[in-house]
Amino acid sequence: MQLSTTPNLEGFTITEYCGVVTGEAILGANIFRDFFASIRDVVGGRSGAYEKELRKARQIAFKELQEQAEDLGANAIVGIDLDYETVGKDGSMLMVTVSGTAVKVRR
């Protein structure tokens, strides 16, 4: 499946718009793990534990997005937008949302 943040794909013609598709992932934060991660992992302003969780959430959201597009018969998604947000009491959870337009394309 072709994925693009732009409204079209170079070298392809959009033949049909199938609809808007979305993917979401909400991951809870482990307080003790996060505390120790802040001590152990933060080197040069980066936290390996947080980066791993972000990557995991992003993969889940994109998988949902592609599954919805496939269910609509699409072979590409254009106009993809990816957002991150903390939710829950004291920002205890991470939410990743991704959306785009499922389309059928041909060369």
UniProtKB/Swiss-Prot annotation:
Domain of life of the native organism: Bacteria
**Family in the record:** Belongs to the UPF0145 family.
Q: Which HAMAP family match?
A: UPF0145
What is the official name of this protein in its record?
A: UPF0145 protein ECA2666
Query: Native species of this protein?
Result: Pectobacterium atrosepticum (strain SCRI 1043 / ATCC BAA-672) (Erwinia carotovora subsp. atroseptica)
